[in-house]
Amino acid sequence: MLDFEKPLFEIRNKIESLKESQDKNDVDLQEEIDMLEASLERETKKIYTNLKPWDRVQIARLQERPTTLDYIPYIFDSFMELHGDRNFRDDPAMIGGIGFLNGRAVTVIGQQRGKDTKDNIYRNFGMAHPEGYRKALRLMKQAEKFNRPIFTFIDTKGAYPGKAAEERGQSESIATNLIEMASLKVPVIAIVIGEGGSGGALGIGIANKVLMLENSTYSVISPEGAAALLWKDSNLAKIAAETMKITAHDIKQLGIIDDVISEPLGGAHKDIEQQALAIKSAFVAQLDSLESLSRDEIANDRFEKFRNIGSYIE
């Protein structure tokens, strides 16, 4: 339960208590239950239509929030995962492969968090090593060779900052991806589905179209990290989250992303299938918008998009 959901938790408890009493004592409490359920619906809408940035940060970090592998079966047909960077090893924190979107062959790449403690250890909490980014680039170059559009799912706190990752060239692997992705001659469409953290997110995020789920975040540093650096107090993370403008609607207003995809009431985890279908619809629309461009124009469109981010007129 998240902090801002406490009122909902209390109403749900009352509903469960009444249902239990109704069954146990054979009394009719349906009218009271109906009233509480109506109250729960009203309160849920009220809370989720007035979320603060820190509330959205908490939703983006939920363990039960859908991951890349949760979405893929609903969006792509006949997905086949491909493994390894052909240099060191396969990184489970970065998955990728080939599938079909409405009958068209595409390449799919995404960061992958774990679903429980054991899985998170295996997936390194979605924080990829250099070999993860090199695997992603290998699949992107393969997609370019065979003229397959690329779809990437961003869902990471950041690239793994451990000693072994640094020794194997973490910064170099991300930098190389930025350079190579900027010039790919096939459409690239990216979506932030949870946390989009720093260079770890950008390593698969240089796309013609960048989308975000409405309760996802995209930032150069976590709110806790920013608060610790700026004010020497990580407890001020809530203030940092508001100041940093890291939520989807703020980032759309800044011109950094192209579109925000709505989530079911309560978050994407409340209805994965509905959320996946919304993502699929957005993917198809964005891909259609790029169909008229030549291969060179696609690469130039992407380059200019990122070249113009942050520009302003005095």
From Swiss-Prot:
Pathway annotation: Lipid metabolism; malonyl-CoA biosynthesis; malonyl-CoA from acetyl-CoA: step 1/1
Keywords: ATP-binding, Cytoplasm, Fatty acid biosynthesis, Fatty acid metabolism, Lipid biosynthesis, Lipid metabolism, Nucleotide-binding, Transferase
Recorded family membership: Belongs to the AccA family.
Keyword Repeat: no
NCBIfam families, A to Z: accA (TIGR00513), AccA_sub (NF041504), PRK05724.1 (NF004344)
PANTHER family documented for this protein: ACETYL-COENZYME A CARBOXYLASE CARBOXYL TRANSFERASE SUBUNIT ALPHA, ACETYL-COENZYME A CARBOXYLASE CARBOXYL TRANSFERASE SUBUNIT ALPHA, CHLOROPLASTIC
Residues in CoA carboxyltransferase C-terminal domain copies: 32-289
E.C. numbers: 2.1.3.15
Organism: Staphylococcus aureus (strain USA300)
SUBUNIT field: Acetyl-CoA carboxylase is a heterohexamer composed of biotin carboxyl carrier protein (AccB), biotin carboxylase (AccC) and two subunits each of ACCase subunit alpha (AccA) and ACCase subunit beta (AccD).
GO biological-process terms attached to the record: fatty acid biosynthetic process; malonyl-CoA biosynthetic process
Superkingdom of source: Bacteria
Record function comment: Component of the acetyl coenzyme A carboxylase (ACC) complex. First, biotin carboxylase catalyzes the carboxylation of biotin on its carrier protein (BCCP) and then the CO(2) group is transferred by the carboxyltransferase to acetyl-CoA to form malonyl-CoA.
Name this polypeptide is given: Acetyl-coenzyme A carboxylase carboxyl transferase subunit alpha
GO CC entries: acetyl-CoA carboxylase complex
Cell compartment(s), UniProt: Cytoplasm
Primary localization: cytoplasm
Pfam family membership, one: ACCA
GO MF annotation terms: acetyl-CoA carboxylase activity; ATP binding; carboxyl- or carbamoyltransferase activity
The keyword 4Fe-4S is annotated on this UniProt entry: no
